Structures are given as C-alpha cells and as structure tokens.
Amino acid sequence: MNARVFILLLLLAARSAAAEHFPVTVESCGVPVTFNQAPQRAVINDINMAEMAFALHLQDRIVGLTGITGWYKLTPDFKAAMGAIPELAPKYPALETLLAAQPDFFFAGWNYGMKIGGDVTPEKLAPFGIKTLVLSESCVQAGGRPQKADMNLLYDDELKLGKIFGKQQEATALVEGWQRRLAALPARPAGQPPLKVFVYDSGEEKPFTSGKYAMPTAIIEAAGGRNVMDGLPASWTTASWE
C-alpha cells in the first residue's frame, strides 16, 4: 500500500473514532451545554485558560486569545506555546471583536473575559452559534453555589475541555498526572502549622487578593500552606492592608 494512502487512512480512522464520541454534554455553571462536534474555531480568554487548552495541544483549533498582554508579561514557554495564534484583545473582548473571528466556542469566566450584564455572555453569544464554557471557579461571581476552591475545580474543567474537543483520554491522563505529582509531595511534619501565604495581585491603597473561592487558595493548600485570606467569602476581591 502506498505510504501516503496508508497515512491518509490512519487520519480518517482517527477522525472517525473521535466523531463517535459526539454529541457530548457538559455543565457550565450548572447549565448543560451540548456539542454535536468538537469546536473548530475556539477563542480562549486569559492566560490560565489558554494554558489549560495548550496542555491538550488544542492550538490548531484556536483562532484567537483574549485577555493576555493587558494583564500579564508572557514567559518564553507561553510565547512558544502560543505561536502564531493572534491576540484579539489585550483585556476584555468586545462582542464585535469576537464575532469578527467567527468562533464557534469561547472559554472564559465571570470577571475573566465576561461581566454580568455585559455584551459578552453565554446568552448573548448563543444566537451567533458560539457555545461557551465558563470557568468553574468563576461561577460564584454569577450567583452560583458558593464552594470553597479545591483542585477538583481545575481537574473538572480540564476534563470538560477534553470531552468537548474529543480528547477525553488525553485529559484524563493529564489530570491523573497532576494528581500523582501532588500526592508525591512530602507531608508537612507533624505538629508544624501550615505556612501562611498572602496572595498579592495588584493595588496600592488596598490590595487585590484571592479569597475563599479563588483557585490560589486551593493551590496553596495543596502545597501544604494556608491562604491568610481564606476566610474572605469571595473569589478575587479587594481587602485592607490591616
């Protein structure tokens, strides 16, 4: 058999196998969202969600990023992973900006590219054929059930991405790898209190920091520490220096 024909058959078989997984339904802040096929033109907001997508090697499905350079300085590794993917907006994208990219999928969160009552929300994107996955950590911003942040929020969202893009096995392997790495961390010596950590994001007169519902609290706890602001019943919020 001609080598090119053989490779083509392998590609077609892989595509057919992936198609068998659809339709799939995932929950986005408690709302079921059904995908009849994997997104082909995704837009991803914020560096953390972009890295979640890059971890599944979804670059060939991404037509743009938003909310990157307006908030962050890029590392060489992130620049390499981003490659030629354009940044459509340095901070929050306007509806017109998103529509110009003709996406079929938007991965963002409340206060991570979307604002309650704004022009870019799942409800306002739906009429244009754009399905939205909302970052689970941010659901509390939209009145979702308050839930103290834990690593399962990250794991669940990564598994949802895998399901949406037909990469369930890759997502499962990725999450299991993360879990093994955490489990391998040495335990804190008996009787030793956890290291107290303050998360500083920005602000001078008042610090902008993470509270009980934000992922830094979960990450710090997973590493054996304690966020000193874990009593704040909020996700990201302004606190006082006192």
Go through each PLM region and give its residues.
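Extracytoplasmic/secreted envelope proteins and their assembly/folding machinery
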Residues: 36-40, 46-51, 95, 118-125, ...
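A short, structured surface patch at a secondary-structure boundary
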Residues: 44-101, 105-114, 228
